[in-house]
């Protein structure tokens, strides 16, 4: 279910403050807020999004606006399905 338009996009307050202050900075903004939506003000900024283990740097571009930060930092690693161990010999 989508968020109501009258409520507007959700962005954590601490992340919004960091984005405002890091307008021309090259240093990535470290955040644990995967639920925050990407706003047009964030375009061109590198945000390091936590995936549960470490921070994944995400360079925000205009195609990402409207999506959430967590969509670009994968939390699960697929190692492959189990195969027949005898065929490897």
UniProtKB/Swiss-Prot annotation:
This is Small ribosomal subunit protein uS19. One of its GO terms (cellular component) is cytoplasm. Belongs to the universal ribosomal protein uS19 family. It comes from Xanthomonas euvesicatoria pv. vesicatoria (strain 85-10) (Xanthomonas campestris pv. vesicatoria). Protein S19 forms a complex with S13 that binds strongly to the 16S ribosomal RNA. GO terms for molecular function: rRNA binding; structural constituent of ribosome. GO terms for biological process: ribosomal small subunit assembly; translation. The keyword Glycosyltransferase does not apply. It holds the Pfam family Ribosomal_S19. The keyword DNA damage does not apply. PANTHER family: RIBOSOMAL PROTEIN S19P FAMILY MEMBER, SMALL RIBOSOMAL SUBUNIT PROTEIN US19M. Keywords: Ribonucleoprotein, Ribosomal protein, RNA-binding, rRNA-binding. The lineage of its organism: Bacteria, Pseudomonadati, Pseudomonadota, Gammaproteobacteria, Lysobacterales.
């Amino acid at each position: 279910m989508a968020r109501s338009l009258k409520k507007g996009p959700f962005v954590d307050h601490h992340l919004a403050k960091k984005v405002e202050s890091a307008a021309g900075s090259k240093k990535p903004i470290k955040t644990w807020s995967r639920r925050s939506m990407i706003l047009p003000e964030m375009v061109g900024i590198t945000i390091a999004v936590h995936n549960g283990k470490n921070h994944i740097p995400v360079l925000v571009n205009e195609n990402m606006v409207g999506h959430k930060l967590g969509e670009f930092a994968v939390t699960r690693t697929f190692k492959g399905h189990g195969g027949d161990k005898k065929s490897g010999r």
